[in-house]
Amino acid sequence: MKHQLLIILGLFFILICIVCVMLINLRAEKIEINKENMEYEKYQTKEIIGTDLATLISKAVDTNEKNNIPKNEKGYYIENDENSIKIDLKMTTIDKTYPMEEIYNNNITMFVQNFNTIRFKCTNLEYHKKTGKISKLIFEELQ
């Protein structure tokens, strides 16, 4: 009887330890997601210039590469439900929207030279439903 009680208590203790480890991992993952999101959310409320936008585009491309996000035939990242990031740039002077890949692949240095002092504002921010990570930012040129 005593032996069975010890086995049951031991199993109960192991189960509690497993649940605690799972909760700790879940909390750490949530903290990491919040940290990653804050890197992009800080641009939501303020105006930035072209050089800052170029830096943000480079960061998004690096993140997509790190996460092994595949590209389509045009070289644009294919959005997934977990960790892809897209940045679109809406140019109001010519009424056209450019995906970040087009700017990045067509010489981002040239973009910086041409738009370094132009002001932009984040007009839309979207999140992945599955993970809560940022999925898309849309920046609009200010006049």
Tell where the protein language model's regions lie, with residue ranges.
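N-terminal export/assembly leader peptides and their processing motifs that target proteins to secretory
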Residues: 22-143
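Hydrophobic membrane-insertion alpha-helices, especially the h-region
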Residues: 8-22
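N-terminal positive-inside, membrane-proximal cytosolic segments immediately preceding the first
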Residues: 1-6
